[in-house]
From Swiss-Prot:
SUPFAM superfamilies: BPTI-like
InterPro entries, per the entry: Kunitz_BPTI (IPR002223), Kunitz_BPTI_sf (IPR036880), Prtase_inh_Kunz-CS (IPR020901), TFPI/VKTCI-like (IPR050098)
Pfam families hit by this protein: Kunitz_BPTI
Key words of the record: Cleavage on pair of basic residues, Disulfide bond, Ion channel impairing toxin, Nematocyst, Potassium channel impairing toxin, Protease inhibitor, Repeat, Secreted, Serine protease inhibitor, Signal, Toxin
Protein name: Actinia tenebrosa protease inhibitors
Family from the record: Belongs to the venom Kunitz-type family. Sea anemone type 2 potassium channel toxin subfamily.
Length: 285
């Protein structure tokens, strides 16, 4: 009888502890909420992305339970409970703008792209796949990013290097690079900040490093006849509305001239420098 009572007591304690831990994790995962009032009261909240407590200014009313009067209270309530399994789960979540209408550049781990990318956060709500810096995003979801890159075969690279430039559903303006199969090289375009596809690179070097074999092969396979054909194409602004000075070979003028490129689409008679234009279409000049 005594043993049964002890077992029941132990199980009851276990249930209470588990419930407390889950409740703790719930409010420790909540985003920073300043509240609706206009006061300035220093408080602390648990930053689940960085795994530590940080200070913020509380307005004085409303907000949520991730709000502590001092750092010690925050540490005691939340501590460091995030496991790699937790990180893996929220790194899979989509970028969520949230219900507020602010404009805060943030980073999220994009499972489709296999890397951390920028998006615009509204300022409240959302989920844990939301980081203030790309470094924080990589530090948390880096094992996934590293593994995704390691698992990517040349066939994978070849497949997504053929995808078109996709602005995405958000309305930011972030200069990015994509491999343009028509032009046979990496070119700039304007990314909206969220969604899109893996043919999206922060630098032209990243684009070339990933899709370089295609770019190199395209250039190697390009005969003088190919050059002659696209050097005769007209300058095409493209469907995007960016402002990128480029050069094209003007058959009427018999030389390379500048034009304004919109950022995506267009054709292969499009060069970043006048030297590139002359080197490719030199026989016309």
């Amino acid at each position: 009888m005594a043993r049964t009572a002890s077992t029941i007591l132990f199980l009851l304690c276990l249930v209470l502890i588990t419930g407390y831990t889950m409740a703790r994790q719930e409010h420790c995962n909540l985003p920073l909420e300043k509240g609706k009032c206009g006061g300035r009261f220093e408080r602390f909240y648990y930053n689940s992305h960085k795994g530590k407590c940080e200070s913020f200014f509380y307005g004085g009313c409303s907000g949520n339970d991730n709000n502590f009067e001092n750092e010690e209270e925050c540490d005691k309530a939340c501590g460091a409970f995030m496991t790699m399994a937790d990180a893996n789960s929220f790194c899979n979540l989509p970028a969520v703008v949230g219900r507020c209408k602010g404009y805060f550049p943030r980073y999220f781990y994009n499972t489709e792209a296999g890397k951390c990318q920028r998006f615009i956060y509204g300022g409240c709500g959302g989920n844990r796949n939301n980081f203030e810096t790309v470094x924080d995003c990589r530090a948390t979801c880096h094992p996934r990013e590293k593994r995704a890159l390691a698992d990517m075969t040349m066939a994978d690279a070849n497949s997504f290097c053929q995808l078109p430039a996709v602005v995405g559903r958000c309305r930011g303006r972030f200069p990015r690079y994509y491999y343009n199969t028509e032009a046979g090289k990496c070119q700039r375009f304007i990314y909206g900040g969220c969604x899109g596809n893996r043919n999206n690179f922060e630098t032209v070097e990243d684009c070339r490093a990933t899709c370089h074999p295609r770019e190199k092969r395209a250039l190697a396979d390009m005969t003088m006849a190919d050059a002659n054909s696209f050097c005769q194409l007209p300058a095409v602004v493209g469907k995007c509305r960016g402002y990128f000075p480029r050069y094209y070979y003007n058959t009427e003028a018999g030389k390379c001239q500048q034009f304004i490129y919109g950022g995506c689409g267009g054709n292969r008679n499009n060069f970043e420098t006048v030297e590139d234009c002359r080197a490719t279409c030199h026989s016309h000049a």
